[in-house]
Amino acid sequence: EAAIGTDYYELLDRVEPNLVFVAGPDHLHAEQALSALDRGCHVLIEKPLATTVEDAHRLVEAQQRTGLQVMADHTARYLYPYHEMVLAARAGEIGQVFFTQGDYLHDMWAHYSPQGDRHTPWRIDSDNPQNILLGGGCHALDTMLWAINSPVEEVYGYSNKMSAPDFPADDCYILVLRFTNGVLGKIFVASGCS
């Protein structure tokens, strides 16, 4: 029988789990994961691991201090077409990969608008708005890293706030990447597509 509660920290203390899956609002991921690590739990974190570089460093330090496992859950890896594409690229079945492109284009108004059928207020909180690059564009980047199997050595990007004008943060991104093996990549992310 599953334990339930309305206070995350009280629930951790009461249940004393071995593993915690963090899948709440993006801006809470790091704090909830750190609390679980401090209580001796391994942690699986729905992407993104953190929304700031400082929080990402805190997670790495806590993992090293505790020796517990911390893992990002990139859900696109569970999708059969992605898996097959990556296997084919890595096996050379599609020839030598010299360029890769990944897009993450969504009409997020169902999530952003109070009238939306999937409205999630935390995504448009002006103090902690969801970063669509971290919250969605990471699928394209993770799939590229998985398929190309080479670190990124250089990246540049641009963003604007034009595709979803009422959203409180940038909503359109383009990144250009160079991998250490010479492969080039491009990622396009937008949250106001309809």
Task: Name what the model sees in each region.
Residues 165-170, 180-194:
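NAD(P)-dinucleotide binding in Rossmann-like oxidoreductases
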Residues 2-62:
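Beta-loop-alpha module in the N-terminal Rossmann-like domain of NAD(P)-dependent dehydrogenases
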Residues 28, 48, 71-78:
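Rossmann-like NAD(P)(H) cofactor-binding subdomain of soluble oxidoreductases
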Residues 58-76, 96-99:
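Rossmann-fold dehydrogenase core element
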Residues 6, 45, 72, 156-159, ...:
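Short loop/edge segments at beta-strand edges and connector loops
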Residues 76-167:
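Predominantly a Rossmann-like dinucleotide-binding segment in NAD(P)-dependent oxidoreductases
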